């Protein structure tokens, strides 16, 4: 691990003979989700919103993304989905306004409503409650 001004990691093994660079700035040390996100990059996991099937689930607002971050939103044609559902709540998915030119506007918006198993159960349970 290296100290830095950002929290970042290369995706996957860089070299058999050199340490894997993992940068954790002071501001992200106390944020366990950011640390987990960067460790997952280090072991080879890409961002969820770069999946080859992402356009079925989200819209990318290119006009609101800071130019230097464009590559973080490019689809990976060879990405493996492992036949899993698209999960916008994944620790590997950017937030709705990540790296936005205008943080009040989205960089990513959902096309479909995603409901967790817990929410599905609650909805089913509530549908059977007699008031």
Question: What do these predicted ranges mean?
Answer:
Residues 1-131:
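Zinc-dependent metalloendopeptidases
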